[in-house]
A protein has these predicted regions:
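Non-catalytic extracellular/lumenal accessory regions of secreted precursors
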Residues: 1-25, 165-180
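Extended extracellular/luminal ectodomain segments enriched in beta-structured repeat modules
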Residues: 35-43
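Short coil-to-beta strand junction motifs in C2/discoidin
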Residues: 55-68, 149-151
Length: 180
């Protein structure tokens, strides 16, 4: 499901996954939907992706304002919905969690989720798979603005992905006729 796992949160124990930009649905995070009756619903927490630096915090240059946009699409490239997360980072307390398995102090990675936007999107009946695909990221710093939208760039993080659906009834198999 997660082609670009970031790792597990040290405090929340959530699994975090990078969302990359792309042009094709197969480039995103693929979510398979079992056979279902009526619409299904995908929900997840969308976070901005921050490169944490203690040095920038100490020098009062850590400010960032992130705006990440992702789309949830069907496999034929039909956009079901867009989702946006926007937040500001100033200090370590603005992080959602730290990701374990890194070379930083305490064994954490420099990349960390910041900001949380709960997302819930209805998926029409008949869809068997959807994708979460990054569209763009805008990063505002004290000294300028960066825009990221080239394919293959990580622009956001998702966690807590859940799928709600009403299972389709099992297919009935005809009972064999008895021989007399």
């Amino acid at each position: 499901m997660c082609p670009n796992p970031l790792g597990q949160g040290v405090q929340t124990h959530r699994t975090f996954c990078d969302v990359l930009t792309g042009r094709e649905p197969a480039d995103g995070i693929l979510v398979d939907i079992p056979p279902h009756v009526g619409p299904a619903r995908i929900s997840f927490d969308l976070h901005n992706r921050h490169m944490y630096s203690e040095e920038l915090i100490k020098s009062n240059r850590a400010y960032r304002r992130y705006t990440a946009t992702v789309g949830v699409l069907t496999m034929d490239n039909t956009l079901l919905s867009r989702a946006v997360v926007q937040n500001e980072f100033r200090a370590a307390g603005d992080l959602v969690d730290r990701i374990g398995g890194g070379a930083g102090p305490g064994g954490v990675k420099a990349v960390a989720p910041t900001g949380t936007e709960p997302i819930s999107i209805e998926i029409p009946e008949g869809e068997e798979r959807v994708t979460i695909l990054g569209e763009k990221l805008i990063v505002e710093r004290l000294d300028g603005v960066d825009n990221f939208q080239l394919p293959g760039q990580p622009v956001a993080i998702v966690s807590n992905v859940m799928l709600e659906y009403r299972p389709a009834p099992p297919k009935r198999t005809p009972t064999p006729a008895r021989r007399r």
